[in-house]
Amino acid sequence: MFYAHFVLSKRGPLAKIWLAAHWDKKLTKAHVFECNLESSVESIICPKVKMALRTSGHLLLGVVRIYHRKAKYLLADCNEAFIKIKMAFRPGVVDLPEENREAAYNAITLPEEFHDFDQPLPDLDDIDVAQQFSLNQSRVEEITMREEVSNINILQDNDFGDFGMDDREMMREGSAFEDDMLTTNASNLKLEPEQSTSQLNEKSNHLEYDDQYKDDNFGEGNEGGILDDKLLSNDAGGIFDDPPAMPEEGVAMPEQPVHDDLDDDDNVSMGAPDSPDSVDPVEPLPTMTDQTTLVPNEEEAFALEPIDITVKETKAKRKRKLIVDSVKELDSKTIRAQLSDYSDIVTTLDLAPPTKKLMMWKETGGVEKLFSLPAQPLWNTRLLKLFTRCLTPLVLDDLRKRRKGGEADNLDEFLKEFENPEVPREELRPQDVIDQPILEEASHLQESLMEGSRTHLDDTIMPPPPPKQGVKRDSLQMEPEPMPMMQEAEPQIEMPPPPLPPPLELPPEEPQSISDLIPELNLLPEKEKEKDEEEEEEEEDTTGTEQDQEERRWNKRTQQMLHGLQRVLAKTGAESISLLDLCRNTNRKQAAAKFYSFLVLKKQQAIELTQREPYSDIVATPGPRFHTV
């Protein structure tokens, strides 16, 4: 151990020092300011527990870092203070002139004014208090509200003291109003306001106190009134008579509109002129007037429309049903199928060709373009129409006519080759062209070989064609019909034909590749790949993980490579095999698989690999376990 445990404790004396030495970013500014370097250095020099030299060195590094942080913070504070002082006292900041930079003494000093508090107060007679008070006084008439009381000629007493305020006294003092109310008949329901008021005034003037008790109908049931049988008598009634509801006779409505416009509280006023004999209103009278409201006013004032009593129907809340899935768990097959299906996240790689020429060939290399466009672009639409008008497959018809004539043996093969001119080019895929642009020359050689074979076949079967026929086939590949416009495009499109005949003899001189000799070296051909993938899917469903399947696949490839190498060495008798020769005419994926197989065999000591210099050829020789693995 290079350190003691007390150093690493959070509350130890050297905790911050150790933290600064190993984790400087963890220290905050507060920790740096709180750290006392003097005590820390003393505890390092004279530790309580013996420390190793390495530990003391780490602690000294922490001391230096904390001191550096303190000096850095001090420098930053000094710079900030210096900048603020410099900004505050820089010349030219004050816009005032020099003479006005100092404030005047009177502007910043309060004047010393001592008032004389010993002066005598003025006499009260000097101030006209009454005049000032009279200005604020108002007359009694201005500040007192008038009591506007309507004169109701119902009660005869003007005397406030003689009139009893009790309900019992009011009922005892029968008036003409009570007399008329109780003695009214149905025949007197016709309203005559002027006549009734005059009669009421006369009665109220001539009634005496004894007559009131005589005619109050209290305890005498034979006087006759509303509740008596003499309802249809012709006795005179007042305006305030309460008529009974009689269906036999109609009620005459008043013709004066004065009573219609009055409220319930004003129905007691008949509009008669004020007289000295009129009686002042009393508190309990409104209840009596409510009881003597006229029927016409009742119909007009209180005939309201019937209220439609309908209760708003509230929608009943629907109970939410809990929907539970019948299948709560996915089985392993479904999950495995979802994981294996990655078609929605994988698309085909569509890369543009590396050169503009290849891009132009890719755009114009289709059948629809070759049958409608010349070898060079025609920007004029009229010329393009003239060109496409002459595009008719006459050669095929001519060949079919000759086939009927007896030249069918060789024509069958020629027609197959002519109708499928792209078969030799299938070896060079667009991906291979993108991945290996160096193989463009090889494609030209293949085209030249194909053209040479075609021209040879044409010479043997057909009459000698015009010199532009080969150019036509190279550009259109489906139109051997000679065109006059193609003669002009011949020198621009077909550059390589003159030097092509010599390379025709090159393929026999090239050595045959090792992979052609031994088919086992072509790791997992196309037909076997599909079977291998199907087997892998079946095995993946049963047992094993993806890593196991990958290892099994590489084991099969390495075994295939080992058997191929054994057969090559047995056939050729060579002592070594070159990886460059082995990877000839293969794409990158196949070359990488072969190289990986070499490495696996080298790990298993089946072969020995040697390389003279970086990026040079790798040579494989048999190892100690070449025949035993």
Swiss-Prot record:
Instruction: Please name the GO terms that the record assigns under molecular function.
Output: chromatin binding
Which CDD domains does UniProt cross-reference here? Rad21_Rec8_M_NXP1-like (cd21792)
Posttranslational mods: Cleaved by separase/ESPL1 at the onset of anaphase; this cleavage is required for sister chromatid separation and cytokinesis. Cleaved by caspases at the beginning of apoptosis.
Q: Does the keyword Transcription apply?
A: yes
Here the segments flagged for biased composition (Acidic residues) are 531-549
Residues passing through the membrane, by range:
none
Instruction: Fill in the domain comment.
Output: The C-terminal part associates with the head of smc1a, while the N-terminal part binds to the head of smc3.
Protein's recorded name = Double-strand-break repair protein rad21 homolog
The organism is Xenopus laevis (African clawed frog)
The primary gene name is: rad21
